[in-house]
Every structure is written in structure tokens, then in C-alpha cells.
Design a protein with these regions (language model features):
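"…together with the soluble PPM/PP2C metallo-phosphatase catalytic core" -> "…together
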Residues: 1-258
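Membrane-helix cytosolic exit motif
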Residues: 20, 255-267, 271, 327, ...
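Cytosolic, membrane-interface loops and tails of multi-pass inner-membrane proteins
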Residues: 20-46, 259-302
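Hydrophobic membrane-spanning alpha-helices of multi-pass integral membrane proteins
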Residues: 57, 303-323
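Alpha-helical transmembrane segments and their immediate juxtamembrane interface regions
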Residues: 83-99, 323-369
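Membrane-interface starts of transmembrane alpha-helices
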Residues: 99-102, 137, 216, 300-311, ...
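Short, highly charged, low-complexity non-transmembrane loops/tails of multi-pass membrane proteins
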Residues: 270-281, 356-375
Length: 381
């Protein structure tokens, strides 16, 4: 039964994306310019992908709730809780004037609503001492919940830099949450996760590999918040699920964010909140995408952009597989989280030092090198 609603959400997202792209180009509205330290495209692209994702998410849950006796109010509450995060993200996409702090604050407001309406909170981490504090001090648990939800949403926004990167990552996380929810019999969380993933899938068709539309802040904050809420709901509603299962699922963007704060703080405390071009995905773009070199050709830049995402997709799968296999085994999940963090640091260090294994570098084919060589010789005559 659920798969019919999933298909509906995919189609809705796909066609609303098509309509959004057409209208945005006609009106020259809501676009992302190609200049900036974190820009890796060379033409005007609408960054309004959050609109079709939200419409598909909203309509999918609304349709699913019809005729249901259980869960209808929860669906309505989930949609209500997403509005602050989605709204502030959309404001940034349209005006480019909503700063980082207002976005974090509004996402925390959304998390506060989730605490109240959905009982979605961090009540345990399976860490001795910390769990005692969470049980004794509800205010501490609330603050930690707000920070966690805002942090995950912001982390998803940070990795939204290349075609298909954040879209594929979000689908993997939501699908993994749905798998774990189905194993523990939590139908409601499974349904919301599948509808959310379907809403992103319809968008991803337009976003990867040609980058016709970007997710934007509205999409990133919406989906990051939904992931955070579903993760907390899954753990709260099912005590057998380890809280480290969803943490491992979002380990890549969360660790990316924490590591970025750390490396910026080493340079200067004043630069912690300043954007730069030293995120892992940006280093991969510059140092592993040798197939098209430094070509300014639009097609070559597009392919470099899209191929970059393939490397990061592997990180998503690397975390998702053990999270689904060991969803109730906290020591194993902690071990894989630690392994990911160490692997990330090693990979980042080797990229900085230009010491990556040759098999990881996407080099130009022999025919392309020959063509480039001939073109160089002809231009020198």
C-alpha cells in the first residue's frame, strides 16, 4: 500500500521541479549566481529545489493520512514542525539575506516544536553518566535536542555543494531509517521516511548529473530537520534501537561540520563562521577530478562537478551499511563511528598533501590527452 504513495511523491516532486525550473528561468527568480568561493557552476541555476520537495512531502503525507485512524495527527504535527526550518531556508534562497544564526535559531524553534508535539528528543545516548544527566535534567536534554537538530540541518546544508551530493546522501539516510523502522515494526516512522526519500528522488532526477535545479537552503534545512526528527522519534519510540544508529547515518555531514570548525579555529577564531573552499568535497573536486583538468568548458566543469559526488556517495554507503546491520549494537556502532572519523582525517590529510593513491584520481583518457596535445601544438604554430 505504501508504495503507491511513494510513487505519487516521486511524480509530484518530479513535475513540480519541472514547473519550478521553467518559471524560475522565465522570471529570473530565485537563482544561484556562479561567483563566490563556494560556487562550482558557471551559469545561472534556480536554487528553489526545496519548494517541490516540500510540496511533494506535504501532499504525500496528506494523501497517506486520509482514511487512517492512527497517525493522522502525527503527520500533521510533523508538517507543522517543519515550517520554521523550511520557511527560513526559503527566505535565504529568495533574498540571500537570512544569516547563518537566524537559520540555526529557526531550526531550533522547529526542534522545540518537535519536542512538544512529537516527543522527539535526545533522552539517551547510551553513554554512562550522560544518560544520567539527561534523565535528571530535562532542560539539559532539551538544549541538547535543539543543538542536535539545528546542527544536523546545518550540516546537510554544508555538503549541498555538488550535483547529487546532498540529494543522494539524504535518500540513503532516509531509506536506512525506513529499513530499521520496518525491522522494529515502527510503521509510522517508516512511512514518513519513505515519503521524504521519494520527494527527494523526484528532485534528484533534475539535479544529477546536469544540475538543472539546486536543493537550496530551504531543501537542505527541511530535509536535515526531518532526518533529525525521525532519528529521535525512532530511538524514543523503540528503546531497542541504539541512538548511535542514526548518529552513524549522519556521521559524514556532522563530522564535516565539526572538523571544519576545528580547522578554522586553528587558523583564527574570527574565521570559524566564514565560508571557505577547504571542505572535503571541494578538495576532491580540485585534486581528484583530473579528467577535465582546469578546462573552462561548461560541459567539462559540469562533469567535474557531478563526478565529485560519486566519491562522497561512497561515504554515505560506508556509514549506512553498518548502521542497518548493527542498529541495536551500541559498541559496534561506536566503533564504526570512530573508524569513519579516523578515515576522514586520513583522507583529508592526504588530499591536502597531494598524496592520494593513483586509482582514486580520475585522469583523462588517452584519446582526450591526444586531442589536447594536438590542440596545444596547433595553437603554438
Amino acid at each position: 500500500m505504501i508504495w503507491g504513495f511513494v510513487f505519487f511523491a516521486v511524480l509530484t516532486s518530479f513535475w513540480v521541479c519541472w514547473l519550478t525550473i521553467r518559471m524560475a528561468h522565465q522570471l529570473k527568480f530565485g537563482g544561484d549566481e556562479s561567483s563566490g568561493v563556494q560556487k562550482f557552476h558557471d551559469h545561472w541555476v534556480p536554487r528553489l529545489g526545496g519548494i517541490p520537495i516540500f510540496i511533494s512531502f506535504f501532499s504525500g503525507l496528506l494523501l497517506l493520512s486520509w482514511g487512517m485512524h492512527d497517525g493522522e495527527q502525527t503527520f500533521a504535527n510533523v508538517i507543522l514542525c517543519t515550517l520554521p526550518a523550511f520557511g527560513i531556508g526559503l527566505l535565504e534562497d529568495i533574498t540571500r539575506r537570512a544569516g547563518v544564526l537566524p537559520r540555526l535559531v529557526m531550526t531550533m524553534v522547529a526542534a522545540g516544536l518537535g519536542w512538544w508535539l512529537l516527543d522527539a528528543g535526545l533522552h539517551r545516548l547510551d553513554i554512562p553518566g550522560v544518560d544520567t544527566l539527561l534523565a535528571m535534567w530535562p532542560l539539559f536534554a532539551l538544549v541538547l535536542t535543539l543543538v542536535a537538530a539545528g546542527g544536523v540541518a546545518h550540516a546537510i546544508n554544508i555538503i549541498d555543494g555538488y550535483n547529487g551530493l546532498s540529494g543522494f546522501f539524504v535518500i540513503v539516510v532516509l531509506a536506512s531509517l525506513a529499513v530499521v523502522a520496518s525491522q522494529v515494526g515502527d510503521v509510522l516512522v517508516m512511512q514518513i521516511a519513505l515519503i521524504s526519500a521519494a520527494s527527494v528522488l523526484g528532485f534528484l532526477v533534475w539535479n544529477f548529473p546536469f544540475g538543472r535545479i539546486f536543493m537550496g537552503d530551504a531543501g537542505a534545512y527541511l530535509l536535515g530537520f526531518v532526518i533529525a526528527e525521525l532519528a529521535m522519534m525512532l530511538v524514543v519510540r523503540n528503546p531497542e534501537v541504539s541512538p548511535w544508529c542514526p548518529l552513524l547515518l549522519v556521521m559524514y555531514p556532522v563530522w564535516e561540520t565539526l572538523f571544519s570548525v576545528f580547522r578554522r579555529a586553528l587558523r583564527s577564531l574570527a574565521q570559524i563562521g566564514q565560508p571557505d573552499a577547504l571542505h572535503l568535497h571541494q578538495l576532491i573536486y580540485r585534486r581528484l577530478m583530473k579528467r577535465y583538468g582546469s578546462s573552462k568548458d561548461p560541459h567539462h566543469r559540469l562533469m567535474r562537478n557531478s563526478f565529485t559526488s560519486l566519491y562522497l556517495w561512497a561515504l554515505a554507503v560506508f556509514c549506512a551499511v553498518p548502521a542497518m546491520l548493527f542498529w541495536n549494537n551500541t559498541p559496534a556502532l561506536m566503533g564504526f563511528s570512530f573508524l569513519f572519523a579516523i578515515s576522514y582525517v586520513i583522507l583529508y590529510r592526504r588530499l591536502i598533501q597531494f598524496r592520494m593513491p593513483r586509482f582514486m584520481v580520475l585522469k583523462p583518457s588517452a584519446s582526450k590527452r591526444l586531442h589536447t596535445s594536438k590542440r596545444t601544438r596547433s595553437s603554438s604554430k
